[in-house]
Regions:
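Glycine-rich beta-strand-centered segment in the early N-terminal region that forms part
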Residues: 15-32, 45-94, 135-138
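Cysteine-cluster motifs in flexible loop/terminal segments that predominantly coordinate metals
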Residues: 35, 72, 82-132, 136
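Mid-domain Rossmann-like dinucleotide-binding core that forms the NAD(H)/NADP(H) cofactor-binding site
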Residues: 136-219
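Glycine-rich cofactor phosphate-binding loops and adjacent beta1-alpha1 units
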Residues: 160-161, 165, 187, 203-284, ...
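Conserved acidic E/D residue at the C-terminus of a beta-strand in Rossmann-like folds
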Residues: 196, 265, 289
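C-terminal hydrophobic helical "lid"/dimerization subdomain
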Residues: 220, 225, 237, 249-253, ...
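Rossmann-fold dehydrogenase core element
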Residues: 260-262, 272-312
Length: 350
């Protein structure tokens, strides 16, 4: 799928990817997905996105060729691709802030500034850092969300400074919010509260054990519910994943004083923080994007059965029908959460 400028995303042809740097690898895509960030690109809300590139940063595949400097990955490996590519050597990478890698091919490059994974093949810079081998006991679908949504959840839970038995509120019960909830639980949260106005998504989350309490703020007072759960304190950690004006307000109002509020969402409009109202809460806000450099640990968690994101994959399409998949995903029809898009051999050059 080629981004041709705001509002224009369509199938098209790209050049066959080739090794450009010794640290590169070429991955033949086997399964990919559509991310809400792809919709933001289509809407023209990502200024850094380069017209003419193939989008897509959620995918797994098989290594087809490697550069002379690649040592940890070999041809034929099944791999999950990290949504963030990073050199590992610049100031930001050395501190673990790989989203801000200063290399031209670093940070959010795939599917934004260079060709991504909604194509038959993709060039992956810094392959040793950015490709994670998939164990034999992990399927492509089980590994599919490793490089993006599960990495986002891991990052959000990590910088949220979750302590054992904390009450963690996640605003937004979509796929990213659920991955944040999964990782919060894995890092010791005592109670997960999912907040969303979409009852279908709240029911999905509860039916699969991703939350302990769900709140629909269109019919319930989220502040009051969480105060009742926490003896009047509020949530210890809040993750704002929904990306709207109302959801941002909910995030800081349900937080207890001195809580950490992690802004995971990507906003399409400026937001306002009413500082006079907030005065005295002493909140700490931490904002995205994800420093996605924990894929090896996440893959271990999947292999060991500590996390399972496969229930999120509710629909499957061949790549030849990806436009239908985009329509379903963007319109949130038929209870869709995530879509697995499998590469079929009828596709050529896209």
């Amino acid at each position: 799928m080629i981004y041709n400028g705001p509002g224009r995303l369509a199938p098209g042809d790209i050049d066959e990817p080739v090794i450009r740097e010794p640290s590169d690898a070429i991955v033949r895509v086997t399964t990919g997905s559509i991310c809400t960030s792809d919709l933001h690109i289509r809407a023209g809300a990502v200024p850094r996105a380069v017209p003419g590139i193939a989008v897509g940063h959620e995918f797994v595949g098989v290594v087809e060729s490697i550069g002379s400097g690649v040592s940890n990955i070999k041809i034929g490996d099944r791999v999950a691709v990290n949504c963030e590519t990073y050199c590992g050597e610049c100031y930001f990478c050395r501190h673990g802030w790989v989203n801000n890698c200063t290399d031209p091919n670093g940070g959010w490059a795939l599917g934004c500034r260079i060709d991504g994974g909604q194509a038959e093949k993709a060039r992956i810079p810094f392959a040793d850092n950015c490709l994670t081998p998939i164990p034999d006991d992990v399927s492509d679908e089980a590994a599919l969300l490793t490089g993006d949504l599960l990495s986002t959840g891991y990052w959000a839970a990590d910088i949220g400074e979750i302590e054992e038995r904390d009450t963690v509120a996640v605003v937004g019960a979509g796929p990213t919010g659920i991955c944040c909830a999964m990782m919060a639980r894995a890092m010791g949260a005592g109670r997960i509260v999912l907040i969303d106005v979409d009852r279908t998504r709240l029911d999905f989350a509860m039916n699969h054990g991703y939350g302990d309490v769900v709140v629909d703020p269109s019919s319930e007072d989220a502040d009051a519910v969480i105060e009742d759960l926490t003896e009047g304190r509020g949530a210890d950690v809040v993750m704002e994943v929904a990306g709207g004006k109302d959801s941002l307000r909910t995030a800081w109002t349900v937080a207890r004083p001195n809580a950490v509020v992690v802004i995971v969402a990507m906003y399409e409009e400026d937001q306002v923080l009413p500082l006079p109202e907030m005065y005295g809460k002493n909140l700490v806000f931490k904002t995205g994007g994800v420093d996605g450099c924990h894929c090896a640990e996440i893959m271990r968690m999947i292999s060991e059965g500590r996390i399972d994101a496969t229930p999120l994959i509710t629909h499957r399409f061949p790549f030849s029908r990806i436009e239908e998949a985009y329509d379903l995903f963007s319109q949130r029809r038929d209870g869709v959460m995530k879509i697995a898009v499998t590469m079929d051999r009828r596709c050529s050059g896209v």
